[in-house]
Regions:
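Short amphipathic alpha-helical segments and helix-helix/interface helices
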Residues: 6-10, 61-64, 99-100
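Active-site neighborhoods of divalent-metal-dependent phosphate/nucleic-acid chemistry enzymes
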Residues: 68-110, 114-116
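Residues at the C-termini of beta-strands that transition into short coil/loop
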Residues: 23, 77, 129-133
Length: 140
C-alpha cells in the first residue's frame, strides 16, 4: 500500500510528471495524518498528551507542505459541486465525486487511486498505484 504509493511518487517526480490533487482532499489528508498519529500515541502511551497532540498537528501541516512541493492542487468551485452531483448515479461517494470533478476540471490524463469502486466507475482514465507505476515506464 503505502510503500508502493511512495515509489509511485518517486517515479513520477523522476519522470517529471505533473502531479495534481483535489484541493478538497487536503483536509482529509490532514485529518488522517493527525488522527493516525494520535491513535498511535495513545496505543503506545495509554493517553494523549498535549505535546503529542501538538506534534500530530504539526506533522499533518508538514505533510501538507511536502504535498504542495510535489503536486499542484486543483481548486473547487460551484461547477465542481455540480459535476460531483452528476456522478452520484455512478459513484455515490461525494468525496470521490469531488476527486472525479477535479480530474475532469484539470483534464488529467490519469486518476490514480487504490479505491476499486472509484477506478471502475470513474468517467476518466483511472488505475491503481501499481498499474500507474507501470504506466510511468511507458512515458520515458
Amino acid at each position: 500500500g503505502r510503500s508502493v504509493a511512495i515509489e509511485f511518487l518517486r517515479d513520477a517526480c523522476t519522470a517529471q510528471v505533473d502531479l495534481l490533487y483535489a484541493a478538497t482532499s487536503s483536509k482529509d489528508l490532514f485529518y488522517l495524518i493527525s488522527s493516525e498519529h494520535k491513535a498511535w500515541y495513545r496505543r503506545e502511551h495509554g493517553s494523549l498528551s498535549q505535546d503529542a497532540a501538538v506534534a500530530a498537528t504539526s506533522l499533518a501541516w508538514d505533510c501538507l507542505d511536502v504535498l504542495s512541493q510535489l503536486a499542484t492542487p486543483v481548486p473547487c468551485d460551484l461547477s465542481d459541486i455540480w459535476m460531483a452531483s452528476k456522478q452520484r448515479e455512478l459513484h455515490s461517494d461525494y468525496e470521490d465525486d469531488l476527486i472525479i470533478a477535479a480530474a475532469m476540471r484539470a483534464q488529467a490524463d490519469l486518476l490514480v487511486t487504490n479505491d476499486v469502486k472509484l477506478c471502475s466507475h470513474a468517467p476518466v482514465a483511472a488505475m491503481n498505484v501499481e498499474d500507474a507505476r507501470s504506466y510511468l515506464t511507458t512515458l520515458k
